[in-house]
């Protein structure tokens, strides 16, 4: 121990500079350091700190000055088995100087420390081999940034090549390595390599132990452990190399032990204080991993893995070396002979010890570790966590030496969240039974060969059609097909799929097409190897070398210190020749014949290599070098200076150069087992061969994919389709039932029996994409059949839509695989064309050259035959050019300074162009100008959009991928959020099926770092089109061979199973994306019947092999199951910009008849009671004229009531009547009865107080109903008639009525009748001429509010039926505020106020003297001053209890008010007041004009014919009841007058859009019911209109205060959306009102907002209120009653098992609308809004809308956000619901994007949107 420490101390003392060194842990060995060793190390550290020079290194100066090249035979220079010492090195430089021609360098072998020690027994041989193999390093893949000299890639490569493995026990001295030989000599360095400071006595020279350059003490003061290059002690390195070491350790942290991790932390702490201007910051590539790889699906998830990863190349290389060890081979054979096949680990150790194979147990374990690494021994139950030998495990001897690289991969585990499909019981059998069953099945299965031939035949037919299509698309001769098929089939069939790496799966990476113009097409051939355009660097170099040794250099061979850094010429002259001679010596130590360099080579180096007879090729493309590296299986050396291990050279059969018509090609042919091919294309021009190359590349891809795909189809026992499938096989959606599949197979027979009309319908809705290779031929066959005309007609005749896409699609092959059926784009289906969102997208949604070429290249008058010959610019090409000038054609012999030449040149310049002069573009006709503008637009369209019908754009599979841990009893969480992956077939995001199973499925005991739960509980889900594939794991108990992947499947419907067989080598290399594509679109495949069942006539499963079967892969004790399940895809329904109001359903006649019957009985009872009271009076005053006239008036009222009832009966029996007609008639009938009760009740009370003397002198006369009609008609002629309200919630008589017009009614207001009766009585008084006495009597008969009505009313007390009639009859209820709003909107006062506001608005733009404003009070007072408004029981005024002023006072007040209003801005609100004998109402309408304007654009009333009710009412008005009074009694006669007699004064119907929308809104608001809306926390009360169209929400005072400044901006935003036709999610507000109801003992005042009901007409099963927050957003449905509104967390929990998938176009519209609306709300400081979502499963629609968007971020909300965000109130650290508007907006957008997931389809990314 002491001697060793002293030796270490002596070797270390020259490796440190004085005081700038940082101490590191000196001992990195596994054994603990003794106390004496620690003391020695301490003394050594103190000594190192005081040592100031490291320039003189023992035995290094002399050797470093030597520049002779060296060569290592067989192994690396540092791990050679030769016993030659360093003293035996010959001085080649001296000998070369004395000879005429330089000779290749001699062989050099170096002995390592471990080899000099040796062992004394033969039993150590295996251990030595093991130790030696542990020291062997392989070169990693090259990087693209490699430069000569001390660059990032060079040093990284240097470190990665020499980094030590886990065995650190065998370290050596730095002097025993070859690094010191390649140091820069001291005599060649005059300044520091980094800072360029001159060396002097005080600035000494220091060599970096890694790069070998010379630095000053400041630039070389870092220390790294020598174990990174398997040296003992520490190494002194420059700052640059120290940082590179740190970067390397960080990039491979998973491979480090504890000591290495401590080193990394120590280096990080040291270097973090370095300035940002260091050389490391100048190389951003250092931040990347040194071994980049292609992105794949697995690569996205490798962060889940908790296992260390190892480089596959290093393991393979190590294993190959170990397998070549004779001692291990002999030991393996002896152990197989003497031991059983399976043994315990302890038994193997005992065997080695007992047979003298090892001296102790440690050596035995080392030998067994070597056997494990070589593949001679493997555990029975593989455990990826246990990489080394374990005596407690059981092992078996392996016959196969193939490397099992899967244990180094990152695992992924999932479990199915749904009911796990269980395999049939027959599958539970041992591996031996499966093997026997497989052999019997394959031997006896005579269907295997038949299936193969059928599959091949179908593909060949498909390939021919695909090739012909591509040749036509590229304007190529069809004769190319035979040539291309021969070339591609040779390459695809001979290339071995296992040669593909996971990063380069596409065969086109291994087969290159080279264009060689000239020759004949049949001269095209396949070269087994690589061919490219290049020549040798010098003509004296050999151009033909049989069996060459090829070296690939990525770095330049030049002297360049730092790229881009200035350097003095003295240093270059001093060091360049020495440096290049040293580099060439390193190159020649590898003995190459051909050297290819990616960059340039200095002239000195070229001469040196030429003198050694080396063929040099310069400036080779990196892609060519990579292809050579793959084909020849050699390394690309990134740096000669830092490469200390033996690089792997390339070997081939022949190297030669050929010249083809001036094009020089360089060939590297490898005839045996080539890993690459080159196809030489000949027989055309360069332009033609460019197009041929594209076609050939696509054909090669298709042929190679089918080779792998067919192999998998045979493994899964797939049954090929019938030879003649129907061309109408393509459904617009994926098949869902087996019945559809059966009908699909029989559809050709069905089509023959269908009529022509039926066939036309089928074809128009189902257009196949002709992916099936037999469909095109079937289409040609059907084109000649009798069914052809209707088919062609169905495809061609579609006037409303552009049919170019579907027509082109019907004759285009999109897939390289046969028998795949793709659904049409949703927006191109009939259902998609009719959806609401279709109008938001362009009419031509997809672009294709198939029709754009026609519009661009061919004029309208050009025939079809000339279409292919024309080109975009041929119109200009056909122009006649002017003759060329003489100067262009003359031969110039005189100098340019001569006068003749100058004069000719001047004349040529003034000559002008050769194109004929035409009109200026601005003066051309419009048609030509339009063509000039459109041409570049079409060309740019080809550049902007992808061709949707190009098969190359369909060689991908867009999927929605996610991974999550599903816990049905707890909380689930995403480990990988759903993300859209565009999986390119055999390219980006794709992975081999075998690699996918090995890396992410078949590994145990892996924990997810995201959720820290076992990966076995995780789910991996791939969603595409209308289905998804779940991948989940189970434990495989069959004990199958762990080196093979077994496959089986079983039907989930009938439990039919396929035999368990090993997956073939070709099937293992199938693309995962192609496998998933078959699961999504290959539903036509069925299970191939076994031969035994076919012979015995047994039943065969007819279910889809890819839709109904569960696929099971078993590997190393783990079973991976793939199950396809259909998904529910939703269409979104946003709030429409225009709300279409529907016409109510007609009443049920029987029910209404019963209601009318009951109502008529009640009315007759009322009139009978009045008759009885009058009859009682008549007994006392038998001959009283007053009694007679009372009877006449009662008869008149009864007649009017009877007319109203008859109108209702007539409407019920007329089919033309609408619900509006019936409802209006019922409302007027109720109003007539209510008016009679109000009049006759008080009147009968007063009759008892009158004497008969005051009435018996009235003479008898005649009274007719015409005289009883009012003289003044106050109803609006042009107004609409609406329905009245219902007495009961479900009363059908009160449903809204038709939107009709009405003239003057027979039943006018009660006051009008009183006025008419007063006139009648005044004209019939004969006895008493004193009218005052008569008026006094009638005044006493008027109803009084202080009296109690003796007549009992059949209507509820809170109903008010006798208010002044407006545009339509409205039934006002005290408890229903919506009826008060409806009455206010239809009242005459509201219309007058709107007109006044309009007049004021117009007056603002004109002179105030020209227009007089009519105040509301004035208009009301004028109305009240009329005789018809004299009754106090039906009074209207501007405010409750307002007194009626005199005309003079009102006029003066109105003038004063008008002057004040001119000064003040007009208020946008209108306040209306009205009352009757028992109640006062007031309604304030906010922003009346603005809401009217918005409603006129947003509400669309139903289109109705002329009201039938109005015609009937006019007809009844012409009926007169003539009543004759005589002493004997009354005589009545019904007389019908002509239509123009007695008709009311009407005006023509002027359609007013605002009024129509307002009346339509009032019809819905006339009746509402309470609605218990759940989910909100505001506590507001809600109501819904009876027709379910609108929602009324109560608003508090704070909401009203916020709404007033917000409303103008809201109107502007909605108007802009309507003008620009931009969809919005904001639920529209149709009015805000404040309603007050005042009675004697109560007063109610509420503010109400009227909004649209988002769920109108929808069958909503689930409702969600989403805010984007997950804090307290969970509802327990079990604890809720009634209507349940779920929240965010409920939706998240549902997304694990049943996410909300939406179509792609729906997600596009939804995302834009959310972004636009949330931005608008953010600008107005609005937050806390919600997205209301309803699931209409019946129609497959998500109904959405944003609600509660009034609340702003006020002070109280700020305080709430701060308190909840602090965590004082809990919340589990989640973001509070209420945050500032900017933050709320972003969170809302992100959450909605997560909640609604897009389901990609085949057409994802190909549309113009």
UniProtKB/Swiss-Prot annotation:
Location of the PIPK domain: 1473-1796
Location relative to the cell: Endosome membrane
Catalytic activity: a 1,2-diacyl-sn-glycero-3-phospho-(1D-myo-inositol-3-phosphate) + ATP = a 1,2-diacyl-sn-glycero-3-phospho-(1D-myo-inositol-3,5-bisphosphate) + ADP + H(+)
Disrupted gene: phenotype observed: Flies contain undetectable phosphatidylinositol 3,5-bisphosphate levels, show profound increases in cell and organ size, and die at the pupal stage. Mutant larvae contain highly enlarged multivesicular bodies and late endosomes that are inefficiently acidified. Even though endocytic receptor trafficking is impaired in fab1 mutants, Notch, Wingless, and Dpp signaling is unaffected.
Positions annotated to bind Zn(2+) 2: 208, 211, 238, 241
Phosphothreonine found at: 760
Biased composition (Basic and acidic residues): 431-444, 856-874, 1454-1463
Biological processes per GO annotation: autophagosome maturation; endosome to lysosome transport; intracellular signal transduction; phosphatidylinositol phosphate biosynthetic process; vacuole organization
Region (Disordered): 1-20, 84-146, 274-300, 399-444, 856-876, 1269-1307, 1399-1465, 1521-1554
Gene Ontology CC terms: endosome; endosome membrane; PAS complex; vesicle membrane
Zn finger spans (FYVE-type): 186-246
Keyword Transferase (UniProt): yes
Cofactor: Zn(2+)
ATP-binding among keywords: yes
Enzyme Commission (EC) number: 2.7.1.150
Free-text function comment from the UniProt entry: Regulates both the synthesis and turnover of phosphatidylinositol 3,5-bisphosphate (1,2-diacyl-sn-glycero-3-phospho-(1D-myo-inositol-3,5-bisphosphate) or PtdIns(3,5)P2). Catalyzes the phosphorylation of phosphatidylinositol 3-phosphate (1,2-diacyl-sn-glycero-3-phospho-(1D-myo-inositol-3-phosphate)) on the fifth hydroxyl of the myo-inositol ring, to form PtdIns(3,5)P2. Required for endocytic-vacuolar pathway and nuclear migration. Has a role at a late stage in endosome-related membrane trafficking, at a point when signal termination has occurred. Is not required for receptor silencing.
Name by which UniProt lists this protein: Putative 1-phosphatidylinositol 3-phosphate 5-kinase
Species in which this protein is naturally found: Drosophila melanogaster
Lineage: Eukaryota, Metazoa, Ecdysozoa, Arthropoda, Hexapoda
